[in-house]
Amino acid sequence: MTSVQIDDDAVIWSASAADREGRPLLVLLHGFNSNEGDLFGLSPYLPLEPVIASLRAPLHAGPGFAWFPLLAQGAEMAIEGADAAVDAILAWLDRAAPDATSVGLLGFSQGGAVSLELLRRAPERFEYVVNLAGFVLPGERAGDGDARLAELRPPVFWGRGTADPVIPEASIERTRDWLPSRSTLDERIYEGLGHSVSERELADVAAFVRAQVAPVA
């Protein structure tokens, strides 16, 4: 797949450039057929400590955008697309947030999958991941990212609903098998929740993020 880029002008920030210095960063990655404004709507529920940056995925998908082609179109195409998205996000971090004191990721659905791919590619670059209704993509990856994750065990919040009609059971099972040995996992299952985020889940996410960005005593 050809290379892609993050549109700097489409990024929604919670703080001005002057107010971002010396603060942790939380990057929001939306789901398939959505846009940067979607997850940014969650920002009032999130802790104030991190600067929030909500990115727009680079591929057009209907009226919205996507990080990679759907798995239903073929695993190889999806993985190649996700790999290109990871390249684009890492390049964006280099130019837009080189001085962030730490970087966390929060992704929904396909954005959750990309957040885990970022963790696999650059395990030491990210402090934590919030994976909402997301999943891990199949297959092995080049390099030693997975082995390094097994050593580092970064904090990962994985929230999902029991009534999600979108994410296949096979993807859930694959994620359930993959995450525990490669993260310090906080798995939450919400009864009756579909492919969305509930207020209860948001409260749990806020507590999780707050614990990750709290100053060390």
Regions found by a protein language model. Give the residues of each.
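Serine-hydrolase catalytic machinery in alpha/beta-hydrolase-like enzymes
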Residues: 2-101
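Conserved hydrolase catalytic core segment
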Residues: 117-128, 135-136
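Gly/Ala-rich beta-loop-alpha elbow adjacent to hydrolase catalytic centers
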Residues: 106-111, 115
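Active-site nucleophile loop of the alpha/beta-hydrolase fold
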Residues: 55-59, 130-138
